[in-house]
Amino acid sequence: MYTKFQQHLQKELADIEAAGLYKNERIIESPQGAEIMVKGKKCLNFCANNYLGLADNPELIAAAKKGMDARGFGMASVRFICGCQDLHKQLEKKIAEFFGTEDTILYAACFDANGGVFEPLLTEEDAIISDALNHASIIDGVRLCKAQRYRYANADMADLEEQLKAAQKNRFRIIVTDGVFSMDGNVCPLDKIYELANKYDAMVMVDESHSAGVVGKTGRGVTERYNLRGKIEILTGTLGKAFGGAMGGFTTGKKEIIDMLRQRSRPYLFSNSMAPGLVAAGIRMFELMSETKALQDNLH
């Protein structure tokens, strides 16, 4: 059986390579940074999401080491069995304070956060209205949910309004958008989205993965840029880009939403907790963000 499947895969891979789409991994022989070593040569690095240069920050490295010394290397458990340390609750509180939200839930990655947010909250009676250029993790999360799907052209508010009109027959409606679209760097028009959400009785979800730490006067993301802190129902994001570039994702927002995700979000329920060292470094990172906006000033 595998011989036929092998031949099929070989042809598919050959087609990918012939189209110039085959992905080769670049092997880095140094810490992540503005300068990296590749094949023994020092190179300028313009392709990482290390927006604030924190991936090799000495304070975060020290915090991670201290966290491992104090709380161990790993958790070997999901959160609700025996995988929740005081560090995890501290980081969740720090994230909520940073974004001006009510509560936070941690995930292994933002892909998990986006993949696990819709199905626990919405049913076939409800509607998801999603930007056409949203991240793949949002697209996959929507596919896993039974809610009716509507799509509007990228940042096209006229099209969004038409989709909202069409979704008025549904029980609950949620508009979903990237804060910053990763492929072109455009910022979503969240002020206009929020106005339409109020007009058509819809909730809003924003993925702040590429905007948190970067957009806004103090790096609080697009909600800060548009003076909408605390007014958006759901925010998702990652610790894997501007916030140090390691691992970890989160959903932060209204308390009841976070409570329901703790009960029913499958990536949260069935994945190991974040490692203590990463959590400790995340706590220190948010402390740095609260102490100064020098990183943002240097970036801009």
PLM region spans:
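Conserved PLP-anchoring active-site segment centered on the Schiff-base-forming lysine
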Residues: V117-A136
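Active-site phosphate-binding strand-loop segment of PLP-dependent enzymes
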Residues: Y150, N154-V206
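Structural signature of PLP-dependent enzymes
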Residues: M285-H300
